[in-house]
UniProtKB/Swiss-Prot annotation:
InterPro entries: 4_helix_cytokine-like_core, SCF. The lineage of its organism: Eukaryota, Metazoa, Chordata, Craniata, Vertebrata. Belongs to the SCF family. A soluble form is produced by proteolytic processing of isoform 1 in the extracellular domain. The gene is Kitlg. Residues 1-25 form the signal peptide. GO terms for cellular component: cytoplasm; cytoskeleton; extracellular region; extracellular space; filopodium; lamellipodium; membrane; plasma membrane. It comes from Mus musculus (Mouse). This is Kit ligand. GO terms for molecular function: cytokine activity; growth factor activity; stem cell factor receptor binding.
Amino acid sequence: MKKTQTWIITCIYLQLLLFNPLVKTKEICGNPVTDNVKDITKLVANLPNDYMITLNYVAGMDVLPSHCWLRDMVIQLSLSLTTLLDKFSNISEGLSNYSIIDKLGKIVDDLVLCMEENAPKNIKESPKRPETRSFTPEEFFSIFNRSIDAFKDFMVASDTSDCVLSSTLGPEKDSRVSVTKPFMLPPVAASSLRNDSSSSNRKAAKAPEDSGLQWTAMALPALISLVIGFAFGALYWKKKQSSLTRAVENIQINEEDNEISMLQQKEREFQEV
């Protein structure tokens, strides 16, 4: 029994060793965005429309490429969600909201780690810092969804343009983020929200090709590890069957020897009588 478990564990670890490194070479940091984002609809419905959520908004989010503001934005979203979570006690009345916010916070925390590990280098950044603003739940989670959408684009194609506001662009007309379209939930943040259309078009053109390469990189090592796993399984089964066959033959031989010994013993006893 112990030998069987040892072989099974060995095969599993071998497949993991073959599969993980090859996939990680193609993926940036996996996909931390889970289906929990679908619960945003319920959360927004539970919160009062006039409830204000404080967020350090990254200036230039509407005019700069997403890689310029994504890293700072996910950090600020993480801080705001943590503050929001503290306002809901973990009791039956607020358990639903507490659970949803906690799950969304974990998603953003994973995005922060990913962006820290894969932040673009040698990029001239904008000197503007995040500005403290207050948003309704609908506005806040519109920004949340847009950041999620920008992260998905970042996974398939990383832009490297400088993050400096053009001198021809005037200051924002309002200190609040304008919400001109109805609140959209996953799939999040339509591409029309991006003013940098040339960057979006390049990403859209590269997305199918990069997605195909990514799936190929995932499927190929999985197939190889599956074949190797079956091969090890077949070898183990063959060895096990051979051992079982020899064991059965040995049992039969022992039984025959015992029967012969018993017959000889009875024959000697009969002769003595």
